[in-house]
Design a protein with these regions (language model features):
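Conserved ATP-binding subdomain of kinase catalytic cores across diverse folds
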Residues: 1-74, 117-220
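Long, low-complexity segments enriched in small/aliphatic residues
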Residues: 46-114
Length: 220
């Protein structure tokens, strides 16, 4: 992703390689640092926007970080509603944008609906009770980021107490981690790859999405 971002911004291949090397080196250094900290301190370690801004010396990059943060705060379901949905025969539906967003077959849509029911059971009870009040209106296949190329990904539109009370749920296929072959013992065993992704994301993030969960579609 770092290399592709460099290309997109006009950097040379050698600069892209240097950026990737720097990122990997910093990642290894941070992992080593965390391994030496007390367990509780390691658990609550976080990198927020304020800390990130103070570690960046380049003024242009700092401004870009702040701009990206402001843009991220506007990415809510109510903002996405007019852009990604339309009224069709009196019902709200997801707008198709081939090849990025495409309609599912009736069979695939039915399997996704069943998977969402299964997904509810993996949520904490209070969130399961809340989300159970929403009704699935529509779903579609959606092309997502570079790291998910070749994997199945869907978006589901759900309605709550009114036509304006909507949420979008994203469903992404998870596969076995590339580092799993180097890990031994209990931590290397995961019966469900979606569960693995959710549990580790909850462990890595100080405040993770409370609606993270998992399900199975066609044995995936």
């Amino acid at each position: 992703s770092v290399w592709i971002a460099g290309r997109q911004n006009g950097a040379t291949e050698s600069d892209c390689e240097a950026a990737v090397t720097s990122c990997v080196a910093d990642y290894r250094q941070q992992i080593r640092k965390l391994s030496e900290e007390p367990l509780l301190q390691r658990w609550y370690e976080r990198l927020d926007l304020e800390r990130l801004s103070t570690t960046v010396s380049d003024r242009t990059l700092r401004a870009e970080i702040e701009r990206s943060a402001r843009r991220a705060r506007t990415r809510t379901s109510d903002r996405a509603l007019p852009r990604f949905t339309e009224r069709r025969n009196g019902e709200r539906r997801i707008v198709e944008e081939p090849p990025l967003i495409t309609r599912l077959s009736e069979a695939d849509a039915g399997q996704l609906a069943e998977a969402l029911d299964e997904y509810l059971l993996t949520l904490p009870k209070q969130w399961r009770r809340l989300l159970a009040g929403y009704t699935l209106l529509d779903c579609a296949h959606k092309v997502v980021g570079v790291g998910s190329v070749g994997l199945r990904a869907y978006v589901a539109l759900c309605e709550g107490s009114s036509p304006d009370d909507v949420i979008f749920l994203q469903v992404k296929q998870a596969r076995r981690s590339v580092v799993a072959r180097y890990v031994h013992g209990e931590s290397a065993l995961h019966a469900h790859q979606g569960q693995r992704v959710v549990e580790y994301q909850q462990a890595l993030q100080t405040l993770s999405d409370p609606l993270l969960g998992w399900a199975t579609i066609n044995d995936r």
